[in-house]
Amino acid sequence: LTINEVIDDERRLKFSLKLPNKEVKISLNDLFIDYLTNQTLDKIKFQDNLYDALTKNDLESFKSTLITLFSSIPYNNYVNNNIAHFEGYYSSVIYAYLASLGITIIAEDITNKGRIDLTIQLDHAIYIIEFKVGNENALMQIIHKNYASKYLNDNKAIYLVGINFDSAERNITNFNYKQVKMTTRLV
């Protein structure tokens, strides 16, 4: 990490940090993965499977890798806390894994209708992902808020992905996706 800015507000010095390069960003996210999941042995396998699935637009493999990933997080990570009840936990695990791949991802991607939980931008495709804990239809939120319209002029395949988690199961219970038809372009 490098110091981006020093702020002196009379009470204390504050430091704004930045990641100097892609290698440091990947290494830092690997540390987050280790902290959030205790999966140091399987981490590379999960990273490779996620990357392969995304580059091949294979959302069934993406789903099965995520299910296996969450199944392998030790139960004691959930003991004496209620972390499994929060969308932020699940999205943070997925974010850390995807960020460790060195691909472009945007958390809380702002649109004119709200925020996309996670956008993945690859050379050939864009994935718009919404996470929910419980039964609310994540995919329908993406569709109803027309989040894909932000990327229609990018000339890439666009995939909408809704992922639901169950706090008792501590895993994915619903995974729906849809490819946006590229018949309409915004001017």
Task: Specify the residue positions occupied by each region the protein language model found.
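Conserved RecA-like P-loop NTPase helicase motor core
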Residues: 153-155
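Short, internal active-site loops enriched in acidic
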Residues: 165-169
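Extended alpha-helical interface modules used as scaffolds for assembling large macromolecular complexes
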Residues: 1-135, 140, 144-146, 157, ...
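Extended hydrophobic secondary-structure segments that form protein cores and membrane-embedded regions
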Residues: 159-164
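Short catalytic/binding micro-motifs of nucleotide second-messenger systems
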Residues: 148-151
